[in-house]
A protein has these predicted regions:
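Structured catalytic-domain cores with a bias toward divalent-metal coordination
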Residues: 1-282
């Protein structure tokens, strides 16, 4: 008989994180309006190889679909959940291709269930509306089990970004240096260091505050699927796993024709941003 992928439906508190191999789950978050659930896809991979180093690998969490109209992260994370082979890996990888499943289904930035932007809902609230409960799940059950957090974004229908990995200014020099090293592994043309004052409640804000090696990024725009952006996100995550000895193979350079390393762009202060002075067509 052909191999079949079995997906288990469970509550957040029932999610088993330590099962060897690759397991697919749909994590159920109850709806506020009726007896029903929003099912968040979660893949947990515990590698079957022994770690190549004395210390254990840090564990990596990868998120797509934090905003539902940003598709590159959803595609890359889903492909990784299918393609990563635990026989070639050690350590733990957690993949969530559609963190805000309801906004992904609606192809919009905010959840139609509660009107909340998932990337403004952290640290979450276990008794809040569904977006806040999902954020609380990430903070209390996902973050404690990993040391590296990757949140893959794109411009949706409102922003035109060059393909870039990104992170916030970090006060701790050791954490900042390691984040910069990991950001380069996506081999994007640019790495953006952007102001943490632009918004609050971000997934990456919470991960950074907890000392995680935290990477964001913008891998497309215009509510399409940018093939090059998907490639950088997909191969970038694999490069991160190779960097920490969690996946066999050598780090891959995604643009061999480019002789230089990714260019760092700093926009760390509010004065680096120019808001539109009035509504209109620009």
């Amino acid at each position: 008989m052909p191999n079949r992928t079995v997906t288990t439906v469970c509550n957040p508190s029932e999610l088993p994180f330590d099962t060897p191999g690759k397991q697919h789950y749909q994590v159920a978050f109850h709806l506020d309006s009726s007896w029903g659930y929003s099912l968040i896809p979660v893949t947990i991979i515990n590698g079957l190889r022994p770690p190549p180093r004395i210390s254990s690998p840090p564990g990596v969490a990868v998120f797509g679909g934090t905003h539902g109209n940003e598709w590159e992260g959803q595609v890359a994370a889903k492909r990784l959940s299918c393609d990563l082979d635990p026989a070639e890996m050690c350590g733990r990888v957690i993949l969530i291709p559609q963190l805000s499943e309801s906004s992904c289904s609606a192809n919009q930035r905010t959840s139609p269930l509660d009107g909340v932007n998932m990337n403004r809902a952290f640290p979450g609230n276990p008794r809040g509306t569904i977006s806040y409960r999902i954020a609380n799940f990430v903070k209390t059950l996902i973050f404690p089990r990993v040391g590296v957090v990757i949140d893959i974004h794109s411009g949706g229908n409102e922003a035109l970004f060059p393909i870039c990995s990104s992170f916030h200014p970090i006060a701790d020099p050791t954490q900042r240096a390691e984040i910069a090293t990991v950001a380069r592994l996506f081999d994007t043309p640019f790495v953006m260091i952007y102001s943490s004052q632009m918004a609050s409640g971000l997934l990456t804000d919470e991960a950074e505050a907890e000392g995680k090696i935290t990477i964001g990024g913008e891998f497309g725009f215009a509510e399409g699927v940018n093939r090059q952006g998907v490639k950088h996100a997909y191969e970038g995550v694999k490069n991160v796993l190779r960097h920490y000895g969690m996946l066999t193979g050598e780090i891959v350079k995604l643009d061999p024709a480019r002789s230089t390393s990714p260019r760092f762009m700093s926009a760390e202060n509010l004065s680096d941003y120019i808001p539109c002075p009035r509504s209109g067509i620009w």
